[in-house]
Structure formats: C-alpha cells, structure tokens
Amino acid sequence: MLPPSANDMDRGVDYEVVIVGAGIAGLAAAWELRDRNIIVFESADRVGGRMRSEPRGHYWLNLGAHLFGGPDSHLARLVDAAGLETKAIPGNRMGLAVNGAIVASGAPETYPFRLPLSPAARLSFVKSGLRLRWAARGFQRIARRRTGELASAVRARVVGYRDDETFAGYLGAMHPDVASIFRAVAERITAEPHEITAGCGAGLFALLWDSKLTMARNLMGGSALLPQTLARHLSERVVTGATVEEVVPEATRVRVRVRLSGGVEERSARYVIAATPAHVTHRIVRNLPADTAAALAHIPYGPFVCGAILTGESGPMPWDGVYAIATPGKAFNMLFNHANVLRGPGRREPGGSLMVYGGGDSGIRLLQMTDAQIQDAFLRDIYSILPAVKGLVREVIVHRWEYAIPYIAPGRSRLQPALERLLGNVLLAGDYLEFPDMEIAAVAGSEAARMARRGLTREGAPLASERVRP
C-alpha cells in the first residue's frame, strides 16, 4: 500500500482522497486524480466490479458489462489512455427468437410481419411498437447533453422522463406472445415491465435505435482489460481485499475504517469518493442527510445470472453476423455472440464465444439453482435456439450477480435532488445516478474527482510532484 504523504500527515490526514470501490466509477475517479495523493480500497480480490471477462486465446469470455461508447464518450478516452482498443459491433443488435424462429436482420419495424405470430399478436406488436417508438424518440431528445450543460441536468431529465407510470402501463394490454417479448427486453435491466418506468423501458430501445446514444462497441480482449490496465498503472494506490466498513465525515477530514488482511485499520483523507452501489454507500457512510440516506436506501437493484460459453467450431457458423438476440420464454432473456466483433473480412479464426443471462424474475429463479443446474438449463435453451452449438461447447462459466443493475422505478425523479446535493467532503459516484451503464458510472466518478480536485486546490494542497515521500 502507498504510504501516507508527509505533507498530508502534517495536515492531519493520511491521503488527499480515499476512493471506496474499484469498479469503473472508482477507477475513473482515481485516474482523474492520479497526480494526487490517493488510495483506492476495493473489497473484492479483483478490480472492475461488474466488468468481468476471462481471456481465452483469440477470444474472451464476458461475464458482465460489455458495451462501450464511441470516440466522444468518456469510456473511449479511458480506453485510449490505457492503450486499449474498442471496435464497432458489426452484427445485428436487436434479434428476436420467437416460437422457434429467429429474426435478426432488417428493420425492427418489420419484425411483427416476419415472426411466426398470429394475426392478433401481429396487431398487438405493431400497436405497442408504435407507442414504444414514440417514447424512445422522446428519450433520445432529453438524453442529449446540451452545450455547456452540467451532467447533473441531463441526469435529472433522464430519471424523470415518464417516471409517473410503469413501462407495462404505458404499453398497455398486449397479446401474451408480445408481452413475453417486451418482458425479455425489460429483464435486460434486471426488472420486469411493471417495475420500471415507461422512460426506463423507452431508454432500453432508444439506446439501440439511436447511433448517437448507442453504446455499440466491444473492448478487444474483454471488458475487464480496462479496469485491470487502469489499476496496473495506478499500481500500489489500488488495494484489493480491503473492505471499508465505515466512512465518517468530520469538519476538516473524513475518517475511513477499513478491514485489511492484517485487521481493521483507520485512515483519513480530505475527501472520500464513495464509488460503491447505493445500498453499500447507505450502509457505510455515516451522518448523511436524512433525505440522501433515504434515497440511497430506495434505489432498487435487480439480479442477473450470466453464463459464458466457449465454443470450438472449425469454421463459419450461422450466427456469426448476429450480436444479440432477445429470447422470450427461455431460461435466459438475452443471448450474445461476443465473437461477432471479430467477424469481418479476412480469415475467421476457429472457435467462438457466447454469453447468456437471465435478469429480473428469471434471475431470481436462477439464483435458487446450483451452478450445474443453471448450466444445464442454459445449454438446453441455447441448443433449442442455435442447434449447431451442440457438440461445440468447450467451457461454461456461470456467474451470479445478486445486485446487478440499479433500475429506474416509478417516482425515481423525486430521489434525485437528495442524491445530487453537496455533501461536503463525501462525494457520491455510481451508475445509480442515472440510466445505468458503464459510461454513466465513469462520468460520475470523473465528475466526483474533479469536485475533489477543486476543493483541494482551494485548500492549497500541493501536487504529487511537489511532495517528498518517505
């Protein structure tokens, strides 16, 4: 662990900033403050939070978040700084597997007429689809950041968009086959249509339909490479296996009680950035204003259970050109082809990488099963959708995310002022502050870091280059 700075010890603190959590929010904050005297405490034995992947030769197995933004995104700047590379996803990202058929090409507006649906189901699909398109366009408008606008203003608009009704209520009564399709897509955010706002549901589709909003790239080598590389550059300033049990703000410093391998120790800092899930922040940070504590406690998280599958095909396969398929009625609600980003002109390497996950109610059911039972259920349904996979499976990894995604529930906008308020020397960061994704988490972490930097500058704290370390 990096020793405290002599200059900061003279000021009665060990560090300028303690960052709690080494997910992408915490690491983005640490990267922003890499010239300052900082320390990052992460309770797990690895960095990255919900960004988990495992390398497998030419491929990788993804077990968590995997969608990166384009060149104007904050994630893209972090990727560039880390010397890594993302590539645009070439395949269809809105496929559907319904009643034994797959439709994964062409305009989504044609799907109701190409899927094996009854006339009543087709009509229901068209009516609900038109309502969804209208709401998605509204989401696209309000989600765009205006010139000179604070990120907090965008967050307030996004969480407030159509948050007075549920997604299910907005779509209205649907044919059962159509309801199952929208349920599968809603479960992508780990909740059911009646649990999320109409705006949250619209946002799921807006991010797929709008190229300016879409997170439509994959990190070459797997998502975990980004947090791993940032942590490697930050070196001993990132401490894993370090569980922060208490954060106590005081007038001129913040005390942090952390459990390390040698026992519980206390550290202090000018600022603490709590880059932890909302419920963890609520548990560890003391003396929060009552409305902020209540808001953190009321952020709902849904589960998902993920399966990553390494395949061993020797040549091209029918799904090479497809990236994502929604799979209503299966043990999982989404199927991804993470080798799709590698498919294009030139030689196709043998093998492949698939990922499935079940969120929302599907995730809750899966959490009650053993890993072996989950694997059997996943493979059975993969074979029913992609029969050619049978006999090609080389490895399966199951991962459980009990608190996966902080979905937007009705009335969410009423919590936002309490989450955005200034809390003195404690700063909040995380994807729960807006529509949950990696970009939001990274932006929130960097924003918190810049606020801490401004505070340190006002206090006249020296730069890292001006310090003499013991």
Predicted segment positions?
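Conserved Rossmann-like nucleotide-cofactor binding loop
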Residues: A25, R46, H279
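A short alpha-helix-loop-beta-strand transition element characteristic
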Residues: S53, A76-A97, P176-R183, H298-Y301, ...
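Active-site/ligand-binding neighborhood in enzyme catalytic cores
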Residues: W134, G138-V247, A251-R255
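Conserved flavin/dinucleotide-binding core of flavoenzymes
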Residues: L2-G12, L335-P470
